[in-house]
């Protein structure tokens, strides 16, 4: 019974969203959905979210490997710091990034000497997405890597496999499902980021405007219909991408 009620928690808002949209004609819906500013925002948001998820997958894997396989001073601090983006409100995360990478920030002032700028650019959007979605890959991989049977590695070594061969043929295939899960979660989180992005990007249409900010701008203009259409489109695109990722993962697992 409880499960049935929990099912409606995500379904009811979606039902309300699509009900609001379908009150209008398909012509009006299509006009809002394929607006040049909206199309540019879809593409830019998805591209940045995919790059952020890929970056997090690579470096998240490396960090997970280090904190799981090695003992060193500061290990517990690093392990705890990984969860920092979970604890910070996104607006605080944006303010932190702006403080560090702004023209007068700790890092930004040195970048300015080389005529480099991060905030109010596309790279700033990417940086914000990476920051807020970084922990997902590490927390997805960590329990799997910690629970890995070391006997499998020892057996591979006894059979003459090198360390690289052992990693490639024994360890990595075991980690792939968790890595894909982390990638998917990281992508989903980056795709919907608003608080930090709105503070660190210029939010210019046809440039570095992401869909979450575009939706907010539409709501500020009392264009609830337009905001709903844009939200529904990016939702369906995200579901399609996640479906394709999960399908590829299932195909890999059956091999």
From Swiss-Prot:
Membrane topology qualifier: Multi-pass membrane protein
Transit peptide in keyword set: no
Key words, A-Z: Membrane, Plastid, Sulfate transport, Transmembrane, Transmembrane helix, Transport
Protein's cellular compartments: Plastid membrane
InterPro entries attached to this UniProt entry: CysT_permease (IPR011865), MetI-like (IPR000515), MetI-like_sf (IPR035906), Sulph_transpt2 (IPR005667)
Transmembrane spans: 2-22, 48-68, 77-97, 118-138, 167-187, 195-215, 225-245
GO cellular component: plasma membrane; plastid membrane
Pfam families: BPD_transp_1 (PF00528)
Residue span, ABC transmembrane type-1 domain: 42-246
MF (Gene Ontology): ABC-type sulfate transporter activity
Keyword flag Transcription: no
Function: Part of the ABC transporter complex cysAWTP (TC 3.A.1.6.1) involved in sulfate/thiosulfate import. Probably responsible for the translocation of the substrate across the membrane.
Family: Belongs to the binding-protein-dependent transport system permease family. CysTW subfamily.
Name recorded for this polypeptide: Probable sulfate transport system permease protein cysT
Organism: Prototheca wickerhamii
